[in-house]
Amino acid sequence: MSVKKAGVLGATGSVGQRFILLLSKHPEFEIHALGASSRSAGKKYKDAASWKQTETLPETEQDIVVQECKPEGNFLECDVVFSGLDADVAGDIEKSFVEAGLAVVSNAKNYRREKDVPLVVPIVNPEHIDVVENKVKQAVSKGGKKPGFIICISNCSTAGLVAPLKPLVEKFGPIDALTTTTLQAISGAGFSPGVSGMDILDNIVPYISGEEDKLEWETKKILGGVNAEGTEFVPIPESEMKVSAQCNRVPVIDGHTECISLRFANRPAPSVEDVKQCLREYECAASKLGCHSAPKQTIHVLDQPDRPQPRLDRDRDSGYGVSVGRIREDSLLDFKMVVLSHNTIIGAAGAGILIAEILKAKNII
């Protein structure tokens, strides 16, 4: 098995640390370059990072010397670069890496809306990576080098939302109305400034800046299609699918919970048992490709009346699986359910790792 060289941008931040933790144990990738701000550049990683993961900093990464986030040095030897950069700096930096011919998998929001950039939840729409694959094949067939490209990871709460929607749409047809109320973990806000302890203890904050808009439009791009030329993405039009989101920050460390109600466009609607069976039988494409991190069970349907719960269910399939419970009829729409996903695994860094595994399986990197 060939091992690919990986770089991490924003390596000292919350998402960057999670990338490092996942990569350090990965049989198919090895960390070759770490990038952070000029304040950290030139230092050993163990001296540059304020490590805040529950697992200790892996010994193999402690003495790696941090570089600035520029496409030079060890970064130029990487097969894939993972970006955990904040959105306020990610745009220009990620663009420079793509222009240098590197494959970038980004957790930042900057390029998610671009028509030719895949926005991917790897257990939901890995087929959108085909747009990048086609570009790479065309360039190579003309005698050129593999071009650089960027693939965006979805917003963390979007990942949990679309996971059960994908198999339902495939089985029962379009969903024309959808509401979700999220209960989002504090880790989703990062380390600094993050969420103040005084704000979140004994409290719920009923506002997360920009989050509701992301949920509403990202869902339509992820569940949407590709144009006839296979070059751009075509989101589901507002006239065909209305999405309404309310987002709340809650005093939970990891795990985003979402209360979803939905209506199918086709009549008659399926039964509750039909919905449960559909979700249980869903196998994501990453599993079929044999990807290392792909969940054995993509969606865990829980029949207990008080599940899923973050503390009990967020780590199913090492955080790559999604749990769905309380599936029942809805008096306003068709069905309602509760969904739980691990926001820093399948909702962030883990999604990036699984995307890279798909790229490797398809020989794109």
Curated annotation (Swiss-Prot):
Lineage of source species: Eukaryota, Fungi, Dikarya, Ascomycota, Saccharomycotina
A Pfam match: Semialdhyde_dhC
Protein name: Aspartate-semialdehyde dehydrogenase
Gene deletion effect: Inviable; the presence of homoserine in the medium does not rescue growth.
EC top class, as a word: oxidoreductase
Enzyme Commission number(s) from the entry: 1.2.1.11
Binding site for NADP(+): T12, G13, S14, V15, S37, S40, L85, D86, G188, N343
Known role: Catalyzes the NADPH-dependent formation of L-aspartate 4-semialdehyde (L-ASA) by the reductive dephosphorylation of 4-phospho-L-aspartate. Mediates the second step in the biosynthesis of amino acids that derive from aspartate (the aspartate family of amino acids), including methioinine and threonine, the latter of which is a precursor to isoleucine.
Quaternary structure note: Homotetramer; dimer of dimers.
Protein's organism: Candida albicans (strain SC5314 / ATCC MYA-2876)
A GO MF term: NAD binding
Keyword Repeat: no
Record's keyword terms, sorted: Amino-acid biosynthesis, Cytoplasm, Methionine biosynthesis, NADP, Nucleotide-binding, Nucleus, Oxidoreductase, Threonine biosynthesis
Gene3D superfamilies named among the record's database cross-references: Dihydrodipicolinate Reductase, domain 2 (3.30.360.10), NAD(P)-binding Rossmann-like Domain (3.40.50.720)
Pathway in which the depicted protein is active: Amino-acid biosynthesis; L-methionine biosynthesis via de novo pathway; L-homoserine from L-aspartate: step 2/3; Amino-acid biosynthesis; L-threonine biosynthesis; L-threonine from L-aspartate: step 2/5
Compartmental location: Cytoplasm, Cytosol; Nucleus
Regulation of catalytic or functional activity: Inhibited by the non-competitive inhibitors phthalaldehyde and naphthalene, the competitive inhibitor 1,4-benzoquinone and derivates such as 2-chloro-3-methoxy-1,4-naphthoquinone, 2,3-dichloro-1,4-naphthoquinone, 2-chloro-1,4-naphthoquinone, 2-bromo-1,4-naphthoquinone and 2,3-dichloro-5,8-dihydroxy-1,4-naphthoquinone, and 5-aminoisoquinoline. Inhibited by vinyl sulfones.
Family the UniProt entry places it in: Belongs to the aspartate-semialdehyde dehydrogenase family.
Active site per database record: C156, H256
Catalytic activity: L-aspartate 4-semialdehyde + phosphate + NADP(+) = 4-phospho-L-aspartate + NADPH + H(+)
InterPro entries to which the protein is assigned, alphabetical: ASADH-related (IPR051823), Asp-semialdehyde_DH_CS (IPR000319), Asp_semi-ald_DH_pep-lack (IPR005676), NAD(P)-bd_dom_sf (IPR036291), Semialdehyde_DH_NAD-bd (IPR000534), Semialdhyde_DH_dimer_dom (IPR012280)
GO BP field: homoserine biosynthetic process; lysine biosynthetic process via diaminopimelate; methionine biosynthetic process; threonine biosynthetic process
One cellular component term from this protein's GO annotations in UniProt: nucleus
SMART domains: Semialdhyde_dh (SM00859)
